[in-house]
Amino acid sequence: MKKISVLIIDDSALIRKLLTEIINARPDMEVIGAAPDPIVAREMIRTLNPDVLTLDVEMPKMDGLEFLEKLMRLRPMPVVMVSTLTERGSEVTFRALELGAVDFVAKPKMDIRNSLEAYTDEITGKIRTASTARIHRLEPVASNGAASGSIVQMPRHHGISTEKLIIIGASTGGTEAIKDVLIHLPPDCPGILITQHMPEGFTRSFAERLDRLCKIRVKEAEGGERVLPGHAYLAPGHSHLLLKKSGANYVTELSQTDPVNRHRPSVDVLFQSAAHCAGKNAVGVILTGMGKDGAAGMLDMHHAGAYNLAQDETSCVVFGMPKEAITLGAVDEIVPLQDMARRILARLVGAGKQAVRV
């Protein structure tokens, strides 16, 4: 079997050496080159034709974002970003995902050798996922990063109970998919709970970014909040997010119990809590991502009476989690990403023609 070929682009010689050691220790992948900056990397990409790049966010000679944008316009290929856990680092990372990077890993700040080696499974797993990801040529985007398209309006002749909820789970490619859904939702939509696989330290910045772009309010969940219409609550990178009932109200709860499906936060944990607390009042949404997290929980939601939607294969970066949920029989409707917001709202009011019925 052909090994996944990886080109490392990082201005730190130590990081290049450590990443090379980690990647070459895996039997299914190998480093075929390492460049200190994008200028050197350009020629190596032409001559070596790697399957995946790892790209440092901030480098001399050419900014990582500038290089990524040119790459995705001229020669689209799978890229995993290596990012610092700073406010600027996280903002640059989310811009990189907008430009077409498949995923990112955090660059450790202290005791680099030990902490980076602890990331071995994460780094190699994301390289493996990136090698199979669906990559699109970058098209021109708005300078503010906002997605195109208008807000989907709630039909005025249909009332939506305040009991209704939207429950979303995603992984690889999910930051852009979640943005593309939320940015089209009106401020009077039902409350939303979201689990996106993301390292601790990035979820707050992600929530703040969504809050700036969307008509609804978006925040990192703190636990104990009442779930309000027009508000979305994002699982923090260190905790599972659960839906609970407190009297007549829905509230959020955080848990630091063991990872589920190797993830904390886990989509299964959120979906299972929604099945228990919300039942038929929930609409479940599973978006792009590698693995099976969320499939079993979505089946629980289905059995509890929820209506579930899955992102279709064509619009997914990685058609893993949606495929697993579909295979289990947990999904009621398969929807292209560009139609997801409309279909969610149509289902909540019981209106509209179904897209692809499973």
From Swiss-Prot:
Task: Please give the GO cellular component terms listed in this UniProt entry.
Answer: cytoplasm
The CheB-type methylesterase domain, residue ranges: 159-351
Q: Which domain of life is it from?
A: Bacteria
Q: Which InterPro entries match?
A: CheB-like, CheB_C, CheY-like_superfamily, Sig_transdc_resp-reg_Me-estase, Sig_transdc_resp-reg_receiver
Thylakoid: is it a keyword of this entry?
A: no
Q: Which reaction does it catalyse?
A: [protein]-L-glutamate 5-O-methyl ester + H2O = L-glutamyl-[protein] + methanol + H(+); L-glutaminyl-[protein] + H2O = L-glutamyl-[protein] + NH4(+)
Which part of the chain is the Response regulatory domain? 5-122
* Catalytic residues in the record: 171, 197, 293
Which keywords has UniProt assigned to this entry? Chemotaxis, Cytoplasm, Hydrolase, Phosphoprotein
Q: Is Phosphoprotein one of the keywords UniProt gives this record? A: yes
Enzyme Commission number(s) of this protein: 3.1.1.61, 3.5.1.44
Q: Which residues are modified to 4-aspartylphosphate?
A: 56
Q: Where in the cell is it found?
A: Cytoplasm
Q: Name one GO biological process term.
A: chemotaxis
Q: Where does it primarily localize?
A: cytoplasm
- Name a GO molecular-function annotation: phosphorelay response regulator activity
Q: What class of enzyme is it?
A: hydrolase
Give a short account of its post-translational modification. Answer: Phosphorylated by CheA. Phosphorylation of the N-terminal regulatory domain activates the methylesterase activity.
What is the role of the protein in this entry?
A: Involved in chemotaxis. Part of a chemotaxis signal transduction system that modulates chemotaxis in response to various stimuli. Catalyzes the demethylation of specific methylglutamate residues introduced into the chemoreceptors (methyl-accepting chemotaxis proteins or MCP) by CheR. Also mediates the irreversible deamidation of specific glutamine residues to glutamic acid.
Question: Which family, according to the similarity comment?
Answer: Belongs to the CheB family.
NCBIfam families per record: PRK00742.1, PRK12555.1
The UniProt comment on domains reads:
Contains a C-terminal catalytic domain, and an N-terminal region which modulates catalytic activity.
UniProt-recorded name of the protein? Protein-glutamate methylesterase/protein-glutamine glutaminase
Native source species? Nitrosomonas europaea (strain ATCC 19718 / CIP 103999 / KCTC 2705 / NBRC 14298)
